[in-house]
A protein has these predicted regions:
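Class I S-adenosyl-L-methionine-dependent methyltransferase catalytic core
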Residues: 4-156
């Protein structure tokens, strides 16, 4: 019975069925997906980023960056051209909201193309430029993403 990642209704009983083979299609051990350098470089040529708002010592893309310790959500991003590849977990909506509220700066985001989410409809759709990426992004150190991606540009 442990072969699939969904619930099957069997009369009044529900069997939880999981698959080790397919779990990677839907979950990850970490919400962090390191930006591919070539994708960042292409966007940096266009936007000239000065700040990476969601980074670590190992994967920051700009010389100025905020890590977990600095808590990018509590920092001021205004007046700067920002790169944002946030953790893709439950907190992603907070990051997208903050990016959408930027004043006097630009925030370019690499995000999962989850067009069915509240954060997409509340902060992105009709309010930002969206560039859907063809195919699946190959994240540094992880291989192809199990989800489609998009670039979202907040440029008030």
């Amino acid at each position: 019975m442990d072969n699939w990642l969904f619930y099957r209704n069997m009369g009044n009983l529900f069997y939880k069925i999981t698959s080790r083979m397919n779990q990677g299609l839907f979950t990850s051990n970490t919400p962090e997906w390191e930006t591919p350098q070539e994708l960042f470089d292409e966007l940096d040529m266009e936007f000239h980023f000065g700040l990476d708002v969601c980074a670590s010592k190992e994967n920051h893309k700009c010389s100025t960056w905020f890590g977990k310790k600095e808590d990018g959500l509590s920092q001021d991003w205004s007046g700067v051209r920002c790169w944002m590849n946030p953790p893709y977990g439950r907190e992603i909506g907070k990051w997208v909201k903050k990016a959408s509220e930027i004043q006097g700066g630009v925030v370019v985001c690499l995000l999962p193309a989850r067009t069915d989410t509240k954060w997409f409809h509340d902060y992105i759709y009709g309010k930002a430029e969206i560039r859907f990426l063809k195919g699946r992004v190959k994240f540094s150190g992880k291989g192809p993403a199990p989800f489609p991606s998009m670039i979202v540009i907040f440029n008030p």
